[in-house]
């Protein structure tokens, strides 16, 4: 193999490695189902049909720096939590039935409870009310 052919193959391999390194972390983000909500007073309103077959959606909420994670439980109830990790403020990501902070590995249940530290606190949880086909999330209060 001559030098020119070697450098050409090295360049192609390097480009493939860089594309893979950039694309792999982004591939998980592309699969998340984001929805827009309507803000009525201090409540976010989304339609139940937004979920489709997925058990959760990420909601871009006006006034919130990060999206909310809204989870549909098997009994038909819903939970809404902030995606802001309570350890250092990184955005948690849905994965395999729970939420994981990519910064330091904290893990939370779908309703925001701590599964694994270093986080000292559960995720901020918002009260949810189902009104017919609408899901109302109260941004002014914290759920207990």
Name the predicted role of every residue range.
Residues 14-18, 93, 120:
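Short amphipathic alpha-helical segments with coiled-coil-like heptad repeat character
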Residues 89-116:
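Structured, soluble extracytoplasmic/luminal domains of envelope-associated proteins
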Residues 4, 83, 110:
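Short alpha-helical basic/polar micro-motif
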Residues 19-22, 39, 44, 101, ...:
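Preference for short coil/turn "hinge" residues that link or interrupt alpha-helices
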Residues 107-108, 113-120, 124, 130-132:
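Exported/periplasmic cell-wall-interacting domains
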Residues 1-21, 25:
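N-terminal secretory signal peptides and thylakoid transit peptides that target proteins
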Residues 28-95, 122-144:
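N-terminal pre-ligand scaffold of iron-sulfur
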């Amino acid at each position: 193999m001559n030098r020119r052919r070697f450098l050409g193959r090295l360049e192609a391999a390097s480009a493939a490695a860089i594309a893979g390194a950039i694309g792999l972390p982004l591939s998980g983000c592309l699969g998340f189902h984001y929805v827009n909500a309507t803000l009525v007073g201090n409540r976010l309103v989304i339609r139940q049909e937004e979920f489709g077959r997925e058990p959760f959606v990420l909601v871009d909420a006006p006034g919130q720096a990060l999206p909310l994670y809204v989870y549909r439980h098997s009994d038909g109830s819903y939970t809404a939590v902030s995606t802001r990790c309570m350890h250092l403020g990184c955005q948690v990501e849905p994965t395999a039935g729970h939420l994981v902070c990519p910064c330091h590995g904290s893990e939370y249940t779908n309703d925001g409870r701590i599964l694994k530290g270093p986080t000292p606190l559960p995720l901020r949880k918002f009260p949810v009310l189902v009104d017919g086909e609408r899901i109302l999330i109260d941004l002014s209060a914290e759920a207990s």
